[in-house]
């Protein structure tokens, strides 16, 4: 690992600026943002929509080209909800998009490019009108969603389960298992 050669006061200034950015720009976008949120480069986080609740000790890692996206686009005003438990981690490029409800338990990890959605967003032939068929997604405690894996609508993943890289989860996953493939 590379040694940090910045003077201490520069590092403290950066940490203070990052904390202020979280306080003034990230926290107002959430219904609840727990304490000890560690958001690396918080100016690259996209949080949009109502009813987003993030637990304590949330960590998000962002880059210029791979932003973290958390978004609610409910069918009506004030509809849709995302709830992240305590100690959740979102890696660069990970996305959570809710139309109805997405709930992540405590200690969940989303690897680089992971995608969780609870809706198809539009029909196959009629792409103008929105598809209203959305069903909630629930991830239990300590679930790890691998690199570029996708979790689709209506899926429940049990505690301590792992979704392998590039997998597409279309059905429920029991607790304490590893799933892989397309579909997983």
Language-model segments: which ranges?
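Domain-scale signature associated with acetyltransferase and cell-envelope carbohydrate enzymes
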Residues: 1-117, 140-141, 159, 175, ...
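Glycine-rich hexapeptide-repeat left-handed beta-helix
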Residues: 13, 104-106, 110-184
